[in-house]
C-alpha cells in the first residue's frame, strides 16, 4: 500500500521581512569602518554606508532559522574589530565573527544556558555588554540572570566562561544595561520589582505600595563571583536605563527614564533630574509629522522616551533621545572631570519617524530603525549647538521634585534643521492585506498591491519584481535604429567616446562629452548599415558592415577587407584581439590582430571553415590578461544547435562540442562571471522562442556543462554584455528586460523595472560611470540600475490612516481601500477644511479621544496612480470589512462596506453594526451611497455568494440580499463559537474561520435556503486568513505564524453535496462536542510571521499555480506543490543533510524551529535548501555524493524551484 502523502509543498521566501527587532553599529570588518547590523525576526543583515553619497549597501543577509531577540557588539581591549553577541529562542548565547573573505557570519561560541523558546524565565530578553567587553549579562523577564566572563587565550582568541548566576525569585526585570566603569570591576544595572508579597496579597495593598528598584550587579573578576552591590528606590513609572560613559570619558552611572522625567543616579553621587521637553499645545511654527498622528501623549501625561543613542566624540559626548511623538531631544551631561555630574542639559534637536532603535555612525550618519514604514538614514548637518532652541538645565529643578511647575519646558516642532534624509530601506510592516493582479499598463507581469503601515504613515504599495532604475536621458532619433554600440578610443580609457547607431541604410556616430552630438570625422562609413563595432588592440576601431570590415587606426587611417559582389556578412563577433565573420556563402572567416606594426593590423586565417547550416549568431570569448587570443568561439545555426569551436593556435576552428536547442539561437555571449569566489566562463544564449539559456564552458575541453533555462517572454531574446557595479553582467532583452548578475557569490536573473527596450549597450561617462544606453523604437535612452540588492521594486502611494482591506473593481483598473483609525476626531473636521488628506496631517494633532473612530473608502486609479476619490463613513464608525458583490436582483455590482458604531476593542462591543452599499459611477472612479443598514453585531467578514452576499456578524453567518432601501437578511447560521474572521466560498461550499476555533465547512442548500455545518478541525487555530486550494482543500494561517492545509475527506464531501442530504447532516451524531466530521491535516509549517493574506495564483507564465502568502511583518512567500515523488525524496534527503552540515547560526534546531507549535508536515524548507549555495565546495561535494548527483545538478534542482515559483 502506497502511504506517500498526496500533497507535498516547497516553501520559499520571496521577500524577507524588514521589521527591525534589534540593531547596532559595529566594526565587524576591522578596517576602522563601521557597519550597521540589523536583526529582523530570523535574519541578520549587515549594511555598509557609503560616506560619499550615504547609500546603504547590504553586504550580508544571513538566515538564522530562529527568532532573534537581541544583538549587541562586543570588543575586548586590544582587539581591532567587533564580535556580535546574539540572544535568540535557541536557549543559547551565541558569539559571531564576521569572515570578510567568505562574507559570512561564523559562530565562535554557542553556549547553552536553558530551554529553547521564548519564555518569561528563559534569559535572552535582555542583553548587556560591559563597555570594555569583559563580560556579558543576559536576563529574563522574571527571576533569572546569567553573567559570562569574556577573555582571551594565549593566541589572542576570544574565550567565554561558564555562566555565573545572579538569580532572584519573584523578581521582574524591566530593563538591563552594562555600565561603563573603565577598568574597574564590570557592573550591570537593572530596573526591578520584587512581587513576592504582591503575589499573595488579595487586597492589592502590596501592589499599591510596591517599589521599583535600581540595582547594581557587580562582577568581581578576582573572585569570579556576582554580587548585588547597590540598590536604590526609583520612581514607579521608571521603565528605561541609559548608561553614562565612564573612566576617562565621563562620570559613569546611569540615566533613569520615567514618565516625563530623566534622572541621573550612581553610587554615592549627587542626584540630578530634568523634565522631558513637551510639545507646545498649538505652535505657530509647528509642522505635522505623519508618524505621530495616532496615540500621541495627552496633555496630562508626561512625554515618554522610546529610544536613545549615545554618541562619543573626542573629549565630549551627547545623547539623542526620542519621545513617543518622534521628537529627538539632545541631552548633554556637564561634569567636572573628577567623576561628578554638574548638570544635565536638554534641548529640542529634530523630529524623525518613531524608531525601534537609533544608531549613530562615526562618519556622521544617524540610522533610524522605524517602527512603521521605511527605515531611514540621516546625515548630521549640525549638532544643534548654536541654534535658538530652548535649552533647560537640571539646576532649575530641585532634586526629588517631580512637578514641572511654571517653568517653561515646551518647544515648537519645526522641519529638519540638523539632519537631512539621505537613504531609505523599504519596510512593509505592518502589512494588512494584499491583492495580486496583472498591471493594466504593462500587461506582462503580475504585480502585488499591498496596504501597510499605521496611522498617517500608512501607504498603498505596488510591488513588482524588478531591479530599480533611474532614467537619465530620453531623446528622440530621426529613425528607428536596428543596433547600438558604445566605443572607447583607447584600451585604457575609463569612459566611452562614441555611440554608434546602426540603421537599415546607414550609420550615425555620436560623440560623448558634456553633451552628446553627431560627428562625421570618426572614420566610420556612414553610408552602410553597421553589423558590429568595437575598440580593438591599444587604440584601433573596427566597423563590420555587410560588404566587409573597416579597420580604423588612431590617426584615422583606414584599411578595408572587402567581399565579392554576391557575398555579404551575415553574422560577426569581435573581442580585443580577434574577429570572426559568417558569410552568406556558408563560410566562416577568422582574423587575429597583431601589434607588430604601429596601429596594428588584421591577419586573416587562411583556411575558411565551411558550414552546412545558416549561422544565426556568433560569440567570441574574452581575451584574458597576458594572453593574445581567446581559445573558444561559439556559433549558433538555424538547425537549432550551438557549437563551440577551438581558436587554439594548432586546432583553429575545430569542433569541440555541440548542444541541441529547443529553437534556433538569436543571440550569443561568452563572458566570465564570479560565482562562489571563482571566475567561471559562461555562454549565454537567447533563443528565437523567448527562452534564455546559461551554460558553463569547460575552459579545458570546451564542453558545455550545467545548462540553466528560463522563459523570458514571447519575443526572441537578445543578449548584451554590460558592466555593472564593477562586475560583468548580461542584459537579456525580450518582451521584458532581464539582468544576469552575481550577487553575494550567486548568479541571479532578475527583471529590471523599466519599459521594454529593443537594443542596448554599456554606457560609461563622467556623469554616468555605470549606465546602459538603449533603443526604444525611435528613442535613445540612458538609464542606470540603482542597486543589485533587492529585485522587488516598490512604488509608494501615501494613505491617511490605517488600511484594513483592499478590493478591486470587477471590470475596471480601480482599487478601493478601506481605512479606519482609532483616536481620531470626527471626520467632519476634514470635510470642513475641504481636503481630507491634508487636514489629518496638518491640523489638530492632539485633539482626539481614546475611543473615537474615523473610517472612509479611498478610490485609487491604477492607470493615473493616484487617489481620485474619498468617501467617508459615518461618525465614530470603525470599518473592518468590504467586498464588491454582484446582486442578481439588481443585475450589477455594488461595493459593500461593513462597520461598527461606537466600537470598543477591549470588550468587542458596539452600539450597532452597519452595511453601507455604494453604486459605481464613471467606470468605478466615483461612489454613490445608496443604502445604509443597521445590524445587531460587528460585520468582520464579507464575501459575494451566488448573486447575494455572505456576512460574518459575530458568530453568525448570514445571507443578505439588496432591497430597495435596506440590506435584507435571507438566511442565518450560528456557525462558530466566538466570531467569524474570514469567509471563503466555492460554489455552494462555504468555509468560515473563527478567531480561536479554526475553520468550519458549511454547505448551502438552496432548495430549503439552509446553511449546514458538516465538518471542522480537530484542534483550535487562531485563524487570520484562508483560501480554498481546491474544492476539498483549504489553506490557512493563524496568529502564531503557522500556515496549514486541511482537507475534507472525500466521502464527507460527497455526502454534503448530495441532494436531499440535509436531514442526514442535521441528525448525525456530533463528534467531540462539535460537528459530525473532522478535517484531515495535510501540511503544517511555521513561517515566523503572521499571515494576513493567502492567494492561489500563477506567478510565472507557463508554470503551475502556487500559494502566495504575505505576513504582518512584511514577509512575502510562496508554497509550490511538488509534481512527482522523486523530487520530494530528493529534497527530503537534501534537507536532512543540510540540517546536519549547515546548523542554524544562532544555535536553534532547524526541525524544532519549523515545528514551533506543531510538527512540520509535508513541507520542504526552500530557504534551508538554498543555503547549499553558501557552503564550502568540499561540503557541497559531499552532500552531492550522498544524493548521487553532481554539485551542478543539485544547484539546478534548487534553482528550478525558485524559477518556477517566482
Curated annotation (Swiss-Prot):
Q: Which keywords annotate this record?
A: mRNA processing, mRNA splicing, Nucleus, Spliceosome
Principal subcellular localization: nucleus
Q: Which GO terms describe its molecular function?
A: U2 snRNA binding
According to the UniProt entry, where is the signal peptide? none
Q: List the GO biological process terms.
A: mRNA cis splicing, via spliceosome; mRNA splicing, via spliceosome; spliceosomal complex assembly
Task: Give a Pfam family name.
Answer: Beta-prop_RSE1_1st
Q: What is this protein called?
A: Pre-mRNA-splicing factor prp12
Gene transcribed to yield this protein: prp12
Amino acid at each position: 500500500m502506497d502511504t506517500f502523502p498526496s500533497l507535498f509543498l516547497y516553501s520559499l521566501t520571496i521577500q524577507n521581512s524588514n521589521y527591525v527587532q534589534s540593531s547596532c553599529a559595529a566594526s565587524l570588518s576591522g578596517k576602522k569602518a563601521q557597519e550597521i547590523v540589523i536583526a529582523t525576526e530570523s535574519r541578520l543583515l549587515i549594511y555598509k554606508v557609503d560616506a560619499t553619497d550615504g547609500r546603504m549597501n547590504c553586504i550580508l543577509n544571513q538566515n538564522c532559522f530562529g527568532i532573534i531577540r537581541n544583538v549587541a557588539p562586543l570588543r575586548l581591549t586590544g582587539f581591532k574589530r567587533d564580535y556580535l553577541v546574539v540572544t535568540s529562542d535557541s536557549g543559547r548565547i551565541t558569539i559571531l565573527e564576521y569572515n570578510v573573505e567568505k562574507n559570512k557570519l561564523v559562530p565562535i561560541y554557542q553556549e547553552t544556558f536553558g530551554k529553547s523558546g521564548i519564555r518569561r524565565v528563559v534569559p535572552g530578553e535582555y542583553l548587556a555588554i560591559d563597555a570594555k567587553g569583559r563580560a556579558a549579562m543576559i536576563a529574563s523577564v522574571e527571576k533569572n540572570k546569567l553573567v559570562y566572563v569574556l577573555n582571551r587565550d594565549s593566541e589572542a582568541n576570544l574565550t567565554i566562561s561558564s555562566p555565573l548566576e545572579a538569580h532572584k525569585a519573584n523578581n521582574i526585570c524591566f530593563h538591563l544595561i552594562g555600565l561603563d566603569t573603565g577598568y574597574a570591576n564590570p557592573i550591570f544595572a537593572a530596573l526591578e520589582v520584587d512581587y513576592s508579597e504582591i503575589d499573595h496579597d488579595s487586597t492589592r495593598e502590596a501592589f499599591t505600595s510596591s517599589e521599583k528598584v535600581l540595582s547594581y550587579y557587580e562582577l568581581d573578576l578576582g573572585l569570579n563571583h556576582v554580587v548585588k552591590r547597590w540598590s536604590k528606590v526609583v520612581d514607579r513609572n521608571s521603565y528605561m536605563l541609559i548608561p553614562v560613559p565612564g573612566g576617562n570619558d565621563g562620570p559613569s552611572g546611569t540615566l533613569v527614564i520615567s514618565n516625563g522625567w530623566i534622572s541621573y543616579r550612581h553610587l554615592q553621587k549627587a542626584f540630578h533630574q530634568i523634565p522631558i521637553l513637551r510639545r507646545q499645545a498649538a505652535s505657530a511654527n509647528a509642522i505635522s509629522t505623519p508618524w505621530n498622528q495616532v496615540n500621541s501623549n495627552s496633555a496630562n501625561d508626561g512625554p515618554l522616551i522610546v529610544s536613545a543613542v549615545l554618541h562619543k566624540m573626542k573629549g565630549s559626548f551627547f545623547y539623542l533621545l526620542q519621545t513617543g511623538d518622534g521628537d529627538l531631544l539632545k541631552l548633554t551631561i556637564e561634569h567636572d572631570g573628577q567623576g561628578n555630574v554638574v548638570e544635565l542639559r536638554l534641548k529640542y534637536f529634530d523630529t524623525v519617524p518613531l524608531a525601534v532603535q537609533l544608531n549613530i555612525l562615526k562618519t556622521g550618519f544617524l540610522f533610524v530603525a522605524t517602527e512603521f514604514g521605511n527605515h531611514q538614514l540621516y546625515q548630521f548637518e549640525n549638532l544643534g549647538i548654536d541654534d535658538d532652541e530652548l535649552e533647560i538645565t537640571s539646576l532649575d529643578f530641585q532634586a526629588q521634585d517631580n512637578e514641572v511647575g511654571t517653568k517653561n519646558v515646551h518647544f515648537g516642532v519645526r522641519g529638519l534643521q540638523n539632519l537631512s534624509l539621505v537613504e531609505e530601506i523599504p519596510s512593509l510592516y505592518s502589512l494588512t492585506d494584499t491583492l495580486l493582479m496583472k498591471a493594466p499598463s504593462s500587461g506582462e507581469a503580475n504585480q502585488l498591491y499591498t496596504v501597510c503601515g499605521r496611522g498617517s504613515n500608512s501607504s498603498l504599495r505596488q510591488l513588482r519584481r524588478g531591479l530599480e532604475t533611474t532614467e537619465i536621458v530620453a531623446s528622440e532619433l530621426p529613425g528607428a535604429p536596428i543596433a547600438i554600440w558604445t566605443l572607447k578610443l583607447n584600451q585604457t580609457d575609463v569612459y566611452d567616446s562614441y555611440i554608434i547607431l546602426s540603421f537599415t541604410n546607414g550609420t550615425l556616430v555620436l560623440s560623448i562629452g558634456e553633451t552628446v552630438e553627431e560627428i562625421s570625422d570618426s572614420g566610420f562609413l556612414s553610408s552602410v548599415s553597421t553589423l558590429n563595432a568595437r575598440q580593438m588592440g591599444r587604440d584601433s576601431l573596427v566597423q563590420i558592415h555587410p560588404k566587409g570590415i573597416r579597420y580604423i587606426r588612431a590617426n584615422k587611417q583606414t584599411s578595408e577587407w572587402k567581399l565579392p559582389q554576391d557575398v555579404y556578412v551575415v553574422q560577426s563577433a569581435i573581442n580585443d584581439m580577434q574577429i570572426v565573420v559568417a558569410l552568406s556563402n556558408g563560410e566562416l572567416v577568422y582574423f587575429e590582430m597583431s601589434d607588430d606594426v604601429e596601429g596594428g593590423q588584421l591577419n586573416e586565417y587562411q583556411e575558411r571553415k565551411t558550414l552546412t547550416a545558416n549561422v544565426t549568431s556568433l560569440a567570441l570569448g574574452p581575451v584574458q590578461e597576458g594572453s593574445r587570443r581567446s581559445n573558444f568561439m561559439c556559433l549558433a545555426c538555424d538547425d537549432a544547435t550551438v557549437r563551440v569551436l577551438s581558436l587554439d593556435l594548432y586546432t583553429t576552428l575545430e569542433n569541440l562540442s555541440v548542444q541541441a536547442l529547443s529553437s534556433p539561437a538569436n543571440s550569443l555571449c561568452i563572458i566570465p562571471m564570479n560565482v562562489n569566489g571563482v571566475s567561471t566562463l559562461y555562454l549565454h544564449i537567447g533563443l528565437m522562442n523567448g527562452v534564455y539559456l546559461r551554460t558553463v564552458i569547460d575552459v579545458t575541453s570546451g564542453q558545455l556543462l550545467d545548462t540553466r533555462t528560463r522563459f523570458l517572454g514571447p519575443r526572441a531574446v537578445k543578449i548584451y554584455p554590460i558592466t555593472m557595479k564593477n562586475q560583468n553582467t548580461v542584459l537579456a532583452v525580450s518582451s521584458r528586460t532581464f539582468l544576469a548578475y552575481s550577487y553575494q557569490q550567486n548568479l541571479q536573473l532578475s527583471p529590471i523595472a523599466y519599459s521594454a527596450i529593443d537594443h542596448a549597450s554599456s554606457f560609461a561617462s563622467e556623469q554616468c560611470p555605470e549606465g546602459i544606453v538603449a533603443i526604444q523604437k525611435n528613442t535613445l535612452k540612458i538609464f542606470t540600475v540603482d542597486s543589485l540588492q533587492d529585485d522587488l521594486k516598490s512604488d509608494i502611494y501615501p494613505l491617511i490612516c490605517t488600511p484594513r482591506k483592499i478590493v478591486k473593481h470587477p471590470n475596471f483598473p480601480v482599487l478601493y481601500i478601506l481605512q479606519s483609525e482609532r483616536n481620531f476626531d470626527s471626520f467632519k473636521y476634514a470635510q470642513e477644511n475641504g481636503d481630507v488628506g491634508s487636514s489629518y496631517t496638518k491640523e489638530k494633532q492632539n485633539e482626539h479621544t481614546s475611543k473615537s473612530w474615523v473610517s472612509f473608502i479611498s478610490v485609487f486609479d491604477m492607470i493615473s496612480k493616484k487617489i481620485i476619490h474619498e468617501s467617508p463613513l459615518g461618525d465614530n464608525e470603525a470599518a473592518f470589512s468590504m467586498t464588491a458583490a454582484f446582486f442578481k436582483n439588481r443585475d450589477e455590482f455594488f461595493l459593500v462596506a461593513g462597520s461598527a458604531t461606537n466600537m470598543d476593542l477591549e470588550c468587542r462591543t458596539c452600539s450597532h453594526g452597519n452595511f453601507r452599499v455604494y453604486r459605481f459611477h464613471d467606470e468605478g472612479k466615483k461612489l454613490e451611497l445608496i443604502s445604509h443598514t443597521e445590524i445587531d453585531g460587528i460585520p468582520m467578514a464579507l464575501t459575494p455568494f451566488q448573486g447575494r452576499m455572505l456576512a460574518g456578524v459575530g458568530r453568525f453567518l448570514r445571507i443578505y440580499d439588496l432591497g430597495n432601501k435596506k440590506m435584507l437578511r435571507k438566511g442565518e447560521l450560528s456557525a462558530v463559537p466566538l466570531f467569524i474572521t474570514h469567509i471563503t466560498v466555492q460554489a455552494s461550499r462555504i468555509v468560515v474561520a473563527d478567531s480561536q476555533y479554526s475553520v468550519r465547512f458549511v454547505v448551502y442548500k438552496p432548495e430549503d435556503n439552509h446553511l449546514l455545518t458538516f465538518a471542522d478541525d480537530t484542534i483550535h487555530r487562531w485563524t487570520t486568513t484562508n483560501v480554498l486550494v481546491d474544492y476539498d482543500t483549504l489553506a490557512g494561517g493563524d496568529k502564531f505564524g503557522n500556515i496549514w492545509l486541511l482537507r475534507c475527506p472525500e466521502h464527507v464531501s460527497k455526502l454534503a453535496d448530495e441532494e436531499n442530504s440535509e436531514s442526514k447532516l442535521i441528525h448525525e451524531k456530533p463528534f467531540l462536542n462539535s460537528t459530525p466530521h473532522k478535517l484531515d491535516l495535510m501540511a503544517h509549517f511555521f513561517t515566523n510571521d503572521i499571515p494576513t493574506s493567502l492567494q492561489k495564483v500563477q506567478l510565472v507564465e507557463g508554470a503551475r499555480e502556487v500559494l502566495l502568502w504575505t505576513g504582518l511583518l512584511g514577509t512575502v512567500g510562496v508554497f509550490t506543490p511538488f509534481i512527482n515523488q522523486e523530487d520530494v525524496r530528493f529534497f527530503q534527503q537534501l534537507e536532512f543533510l543540510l540540517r546536519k552540515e549547515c546548523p542554524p547560526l544562532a544555535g536553534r534546531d532547524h526541525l524544532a524551529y519549523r515545528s514551533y507549535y506543531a510538527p512540520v508536515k509535508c513541507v520542504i524548507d526552500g530557504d534551508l535548501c538554498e543555503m547549499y549555495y553558501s557552503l564550502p565546495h568540499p561540503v557541497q561535494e559531499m552532500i552531492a555524493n550522498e544524493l548521487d548527483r553532481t554539485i551542478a545538478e543539485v544547484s539546478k534542482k534548487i534553482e528550478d524551484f525558485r524559477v518556477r515559483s517566482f
